[in-house]
Amino acid sequence: MDSYKQYIKQALPNLSIHSYKQNEEGWDNIAVIINDDLLFRFPRKQEYAKRIPLEKKLCTLLSHSLQEIEVPKYHLLYKKDTDTIPLCSYYTLIHGEPLQKEIVTTLEKKELKAIITQLATFLAALHNIPLKQVTTLGFPIEKTITYWKELQTKLNQYLTNMFTSLQKSALHHLFENFFACIATSTFQNTIIHADFTHHHILFNKQNKSISGIIDFGDAQIGDPAFDFAGLYYDFGREFTTSVYEQYSTIISHHDPLLIHRITSFYQYSPLLHNIIYNFETKNALKFIADTEQLKAILQGRD
């Protein structure tokens, strides 16, 4: 803890530190909040650090087309002036709390409608950024068929002793149907947030609206439907469909099968990724709980 505090003091000598909070829950970064005003993100690995300048460029682009929703305004800090990879980034804290399901269920109809509009507007603004522009910036295409096949292989390996042959077969069909769907799809790739879950959607309790979207560290070029996966997983079908219906009226390209890709596969993506993460980080309790959830889903799909 002291090493981060020490570094911040050295990098910003004029900053008086009155309060210091450290959050190590993130998969990619350790977050440090200073004076309830500045949020510093220290990447856990070099590969995450390399993404920070891209994240900054994307947020700058997005800020031009967003009125109500804030995105981080990044400042980058380097260990040495000659370095090209930042040691960390920081931005003025966007106040709000993660949009939990409990918050959504307590909203009045009018408030809920306003939030749905905000989310649809944000996703459309992101997905409408010209592909040529983000390709030039250097955003990668990551969630290819190869990526999903590797994910499938890992799941088969990690779950082999916990699944019956019927469950293994159901998991196989889930993936094979998705691969067949992608093979016949003609959707257009866009820039995607790729980690659009309640953790990264900030809600302002006072005015009952979305105050900001954060953590663009996984941003990449990919299937726009993937950005609805977290919404579906966190808030369910009705909410996600409402966001999609508004989104489809403002998005620049027509994609009639987008909702099908969400309901048939992407809605399970957060759970599948959690299973792998919890196995690899040896979190047995969460791994078992997630595996039981997947078993119930596969049984329901038979």
Language model regions located:
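Short beta-strand segments
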Residues: 41-43, 75-76, 191-194, 213-214, ...
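ATP-binding pocket architecture of kinase catalytic cores
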Residues: 18-146, 186
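Active-site acidic catalytic loop and adjacent metal/ATP-binding pocket
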Residues: 29-33, 40, 173-226
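Nucleotide-sugar-dependent glycosyltransferase catalytic core
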Residues: 48, 144-152, 226-233
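Short helix-capping segments at alpha-helix termini
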Residues: 64-69, 166, 250-255
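Helix-rich C-terminal or lid/interface subdomains of diverse kinases
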Residues: 114-117, 221, 229-302
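Short, surface-exposed alpha-helical segments at coil->helix boundaries
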Residues: 2-5, 56, 241-244
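An alpha-helical support segment within catalytic cores of ATP-dependent transferases
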Residues: 2-15, 79-82, 95, 105-117, ...
